[in-house]
A protein has these predicted regions:
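Nucleotide-activated donor-dependent transferases that construct or modify glycoconjugates
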Residues: 2-15
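A short, well-ordered alpha-helix in the C-terminal region of glycosyltransferases
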Residues: 328-342
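Acidic donor-binding loop of glycosyltransferase active sites
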Residues: 258-269
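Donor-nucleotide binding loops and adjacent catalytic segments primarily
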Residues: 189-259
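A nucleotide-sugar donor-handling region in carbohydrate enzymes
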Residues: 139-202
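C-terminal alpha-helical cap of glycosyltransferases
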Residues: 341-355
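Conserved nucleotide-sugar phosphate-binding/catalytic loop shared by glycosyltransferases and other
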Residues: 35-88, 307-309
Length: 355
């Protein structure tokens, strides 16, 4: 599959996670098959344009669209256009770049379902969908849901029987730096605070205000994207505190995770990265789709979670409980590694190319 188009979006509303996992998949497709990959995304604040271009992929921008298009989908307004219109824009934008047919279209968007897929059937050989909600119909050849303990019955009536399904963390899309990562036992009480790329609700600062005066903490590493909405405010806060180090769009996240004893962050796609690094987490739920991930990982014994509106009341106790438990028991690292091994990207791409 030499020509591939990806339809995904990022913004302060949506976050950057969809683009990041598509970048991981695109990198592996390029590595294994020398594919040319086009990212088609809507213009928006925080739309990850620079990340896509810096990775060396073709960037194709759609206009900003409308604020709240009428849709029957739970996240239909995220698309900022009716589905059929978006599909035609997608094809037209690629046509203007001299692309009239592709081998594979990858779709990672909660605002897209089977209607969009049908509209682009004459434009592509295969369709690959990334989802984790299981709340809408798909007309695709491949479906990936990397949620821990995901089972086939989740999509029983949502995809055809011919669809190749990649389900569970065995297929988690992680960057190459996590393949073969060797977690080490961490003695110092070092925390990693990381809420994804844009952190529009500024949970980073809310967390830091709660934990910075905990007397038994040795170090706090904070990770934010250069496109984070509140980067200046967080940066100013961190600069005046010796305990805290701010890392902006670092390229050594796996190392930072492996050198931390406990993380505080969202229950999104970085959950699998933390597990590969053997890093337990206090997860803060900030979106409904994170609750399924958080619940399953709490049952596995690798996280505990709180709601975002309970940070002030519950976070300090959760951190204390974890640090006490980790000082007595090393089994938590093994529990994390049982969730995800870090080789999912290779498995997915090998499956596509060998189909």
């Amino acid at each position: 599959m030499k020509n591939i188009a990806i339809r995904t979006d990022a913004s302060h509303q949506i976050g950057i996670g969809h683009v990041m996992r598509c970048l991981t998949l695109a990198n592996e497709l390029r590595k294994q098959n020398n594919a040319t990959v086009f990212f088609v995304t809507r213009k928006a604040e925080g739309n990850a344009e620079e990340k896509i271009k810096d990775a060396g992929f073709e960037y194709v921008e759609l206009d900003t669209g409308v604020d709240a298009p009428i849709s029957y989908l739970n996240h239909g307004n995220w698309l900022r256009a009716p589905q059929l219109s978006d599909a035609e824009e997608f094809k037209s934008a690629l046509n203007r770049r001299g692309v009239f047919y592709v081998d594979l279209v990858i779709v990672d968007h909660y605002g897209i379902d089977y209607l969009w897929h049908k509209q682009i059937k004459n434009f592509t050989k295969k369709i690959f969908v990334i989802d984790d909600l299981g709340d809408r119909l798909h007309d695709c050849d491949y479906l990936l849901d990397q949620t821990y303990s995901c089972k086939a019955d989740k999509y029983k009536n949502l995809v055809s029987s011919e669809c190749n399904q990649y389900l569970g963390t065995l297929y988690a899309l992680l960057r190459p730096e996590f393949e073969g990562l060797q977690p080490v036992k961490v003695d110092e009480n070092s925390l990693l605070v990381m809420f994804g790329g844009t952190d529009p609700d500024n949970l980073t600062l809310k967390v830091l205000n709660v934990i910075e005066n905990m007397s038994y903490l040795d170090k706090i590493n904070v990770v934010l994207s250069g496109s984070a909405k509140n980067l200046v405010e967080v940066s100013t806060y961190c600069q005046s505190r010796d305990l805290i180090s701010l890392h902006i769009s670092p390229n050594n996240i796996a190392k930072l995770m492996a050198e931390s004893k406990l993380a505080i962050g969202a229950a999104g796609t970085t959950s699998w990265e933390r597990c590969v690094a053997g890093l337990p987490t206090v997860a803060v739920i900030q979106a409904f789709n994170q609750r399924e991930i958080a619940s399953s990982l709490q049952k596995a014994g690798v996280i505990s979670y709180i709601e975002a509106n309970n940070i002030d009341d519950q976070l300090k106790d959760k951190v204390s409980e974890w640090l006490i438990a980790l000082s007595k028991d090393n089994d938590y690292m093994e529990k994390c590694l049982d969730v995800c091994d870090g080789y999912g990207t290779n498995r997915v791409v090998s499956g596509i190319l060998n189909d």
